[in-house]
């Protein structure tokens, strides 16, 4: 039996392969996709509302969409590249870059992006992006992971109460709307490309 029956292609693979029975697409295509998605993450970091110490950005929405559309491997590679760029000092984060930034108050959210992309991307590879309630659950789980990592690191620096008041409460409503927007967009993208089963 073909192993392809256990897993389904991500949207990006299905879109590029046009329904062909293949396990992977080319290394060059994957690399280009990862670079493009990392640029989207950079841009989403720069669209922000200045709050202290955690800015409100479009990055959670970008993480949700990239992970659900591209699957685990590309999503994890994208976030890894993004974090590496920031770690070596490139100004890709909301307020710059550098290793101290990752170790600072907002670093936990950035590390949460990596774990969230792994979990959401894995579920997307299993076809969850094609089913509304499954995609919503996957993205809610991803959001919770981002909050968990962010709150833990922020509380270690500023205290738990501060972390909840400044690192969680101001973002709940906005992230809820981002989740709703992603949930609306995903099925439409599958339908528009005519690859939804």
Over which residues does each language-model region extend?
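Residue-level recognition of membrane-helix boundary sites in multi-pass small-molecule transporters
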Residues: 73-74, 107, 134, 162
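Hydrophobic transmembrane alpha-helices
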Residues: 2-76
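Short helix-perturbing small/polar motifs within transmembrane alpha-helices
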Residues: 3-22, 29, 43, 99-148
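Membrane-embedded alpha-helical hairpins and interfacial helices in multi-pass inner-membrane proteins
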Residues: 129-197
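Short helix-capping/hinge motifs at transmembrane helix termini and TM-loop junctions
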Residues: 45-52, 70, 89, 94, ...
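Non-cytosolic membrane-interface motifs at loop->transmembrane helix junctions
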Residues: 55-60, 97-105, 162-171
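Interfacial aromatic-anchored transmembrane helix boundaries in multi-pass membrane proteins
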Residues: 45-55, 83-116
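Alpha-helical transmembrane segments in multi-pass membrane proteins
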Residues: 33-44, 63, 67, 78-86, ...
